[in-house]
Swiss-Prot record:
Protein location: Plastid, Chloroplast thylakoid membrane
Membrane topology: Single-pass membrane protein
Taxonomic classification: Eukaryota, Discoba, Euglenozoa, Euglenida, Spirocuta
Self-association state and partner proteins as the record states: PSII is composed of 1 copy each of membrane proteins PsbA, PsbB, PsbC, PsbD, PsbE, PsbF, PsbH, PsbI, PsbJ, PsbK, PsbL, PsbM, PsbT, PsbY, PsbZ, Psb30/Ycf12, at least 3 peripheral proteins of the oxygen-evolving complex and a large number of cofactors. It forms dimeric complexes.
Protein name: Photosystem II reaction center protein Z
Species: Euglena anabaena (Euglenaria anabaena)
Family: Belongs to the PsbZ family.
Example of a GO cellular component annotation carried by this entry: chloroplast thylakoid membrane
Database matches in InterPro entries: PSII_PsbZ, PSII_PsbZ_sf
Length: 32
């Protein structure tokens, strides 16, 4: 059970980072 929760946190964290990177990249593309 603990391992499953860890996996969920890793997935959510990865998705959050991916979204953040995409957002920053899009903003940079629009600004420049």
């Amino acid at each position: 059970n603990g391992w499953n929760e860890n996996k969920n946190y890793i997935l959510i964290g990865s998705a959050a980072w991916a979204g953040l990177v995409l957002l920053v990249g899009t903003l940079n593309y629009l600004v420049i």
